[in-house]
Amino acid sequence: MKATISITTIFLVVALAAPSLARPDNHVEDSVGRLLRPGQTYHIVPANPETGGGIFSNSEEICPLDIFQSNNPLDLGLPIKFKSELWFVKEMNSITIEFEAPNWFLCPKESKGWRVVYSEEFKKSLIISTGGSSNPSGFQIHRVDGGAYKIVYCTNISTTTCMNVGIFTDISGARRLALTSDEALLVKFQKAATPKADLKTKLRMFPFY
C-alpha cells in the first residue's frame, strides 16, 4: 500500500545538492542533438544500453500505475512528453513528465503525469508513480558527463536541493524508478516514431520486465 505521509519531510532528510554541468543556454537536447520540445513525444532510454531498456508503467494494484525500467535493451518503453512554461525544455527548470499512451485503458480516469509517492511496501521508498498534476511537478533535467542527462526531483521548498531519479530493484527483480541520494539513472531522450507507427509497436501496456 502507498501511504500518504509528508514526502517533503522525508525528502529533506536525505536529499543531496548536486553540482551543475548545465550548458550556457541550458537547452536540453535529444539523442541526435536537437532541442527537446514540450508537447513532442520521446522515449527515455538509458545512456548506456547495457543497463536495460526504456521506461513503462505497471502496477500490481492497477491504479495508479508505478513506473519501471525494462530489463530488455531492445524495448524503448512507452513514449512520454514534457510540459513546460517555455518553448523549449531547459535544464534545471521544473517540468511535467507524462506518458503519451492512447491505450491508457486500464486507468482511463488516472492522470498520466509522473509524481512521487511514499511506499511502505518497498522499504519506505519514494517511488515514481502516475497520477501527477498537469502543473510543473518538481521534476527537472540535469546534464551530466558524456552528453547524458539525469532526471531529478526538487521540492517546492528548495529548488536547489534535489534527489536523483534512480532504480530500486524490488524482490521480484522489477526495476522501479525511485528517488535516491545515490546513483542516478543516466538517460538520453530519443525522438519517438510517428504516433501511428509507435502505437503499432506499443499496443501492450505492460512490456516484459
Curated annotation (Swiss-Prot):
InterPro entries: KTI1, Kunitz_inhibitor_STI-like_sf, Prot_inh_Kunz-lg. One of its GO terms (molecular function) is peptidase inhibitor activity. Glycans are attached at residue 156. It comes from the Eukaryota. Disulfide bonds join 63-107, 154-162. Keywords: Disulfide bond, Glycoprotein, Protease inhibitor, Serine protease inhibitor, Signal. The keyword Transferase does not apply. Residues 1-22 form the signal peptide. Transmembrane segments: none annotated. It holds the Pfam family Kunitz_legume. GO terms for biological process: response to water deprivation. SMART domains: STI. Induction: Induced by infestation with spider mites. Down-regulated in roots in response to drought stress. Exhibits Kunitz trypsin protease inhibitor activity. PANTHER family: KUNITZ TRYPSIN INHIBITOR 1-RELATED, KUNITZ TRYPSIN INHIBITOR 2. Belongs to the protease inhibitor I3 (leguminous Kunitz-type inhibitor) family. This is Kunitz trypsin inhibitor 1. It comes from Arabidopsis thaliana (Mouse-ear cress).
